[in-house]
């Protein structure tokens, strides 16, 4: 979803930072953004997306500058072309990368060290449905991948194919312990 009007931007801030059930207040918004890294990152991310959708070189330049600032301060690289619906949550805004050809549905939770994207720029977009909860250290890489609605993705999962609705996805990891070989063993 593209943020094209200031009213839409304000509605996103209201939903994601203040909570939809609470009355909107600029003072509360400013206070929460100042005190919480997740809210601060969301505030500036949404502002950069809004500026990116506006016509003109000045607003595009401002959007790019804000986006670079998020990358420097938090390590969050959510490209300006990514389409992200309401309800994004960045619990620990550190080392999160989302490429421009990604569409994320409503109420998505991205945790630290998550990468969502494709190898080539011309690939089909990756689509995440509504209510997707992504664990820490996950990679979703490929072309035309669709993650369904109400999906939970376990920590350290690697996804390169579609995931259906209403499932929990984990990547099995087998641990093997081998004794070290010394020169005496050889």
Q: Which stretches of residues belong to each language-model region?
A:
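Terminal amphipathic alpha-helical/low-complexity segments used for targeting or macromolecular assembly
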Residues: 1-74, 182-186
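Left-handed beta-helix
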Residues: 74, 80, 85-86, 91-100, ...
């Amino acid at each position: 979803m593209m943020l094209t009007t200031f009213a839409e931007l304000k509605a996103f801030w209201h939903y994601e930072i203040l909570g939809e059930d609470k009355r909107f207040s600029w003072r509360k918004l400013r206070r929460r953004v100042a005190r919480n890294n997740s809210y601060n990152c969301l505030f500036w991310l949404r502002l950069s997306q809004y500026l990116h959708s506006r016509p003109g070189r000045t607003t595009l330049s401002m959007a790019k500058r804000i986006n670079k600032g998020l990358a420097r301060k938090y390590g969050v690289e959510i490209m300006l072309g990514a389409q992200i619906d309401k309800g994004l949550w960045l619990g620990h805004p550190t080392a999160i990368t989302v490429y421009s050809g990604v569409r994320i549905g409503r109420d998505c939770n991205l945790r630290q060290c998550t990468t969502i994207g494709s190898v080539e720029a011309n690939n089909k977009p990756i689509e995440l449905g509504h209510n997707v909860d992504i664990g820490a250290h996950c990679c979703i890489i490929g072309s035309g991948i669709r993650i369904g609605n109400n999906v939970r993705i376990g920590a350290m999962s690697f996804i390169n194919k579609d995931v259906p609705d209403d499932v929990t996805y984990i990547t099995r990891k087998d641990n093997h312990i081998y004794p070290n070989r010394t020169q005496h063993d050889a």
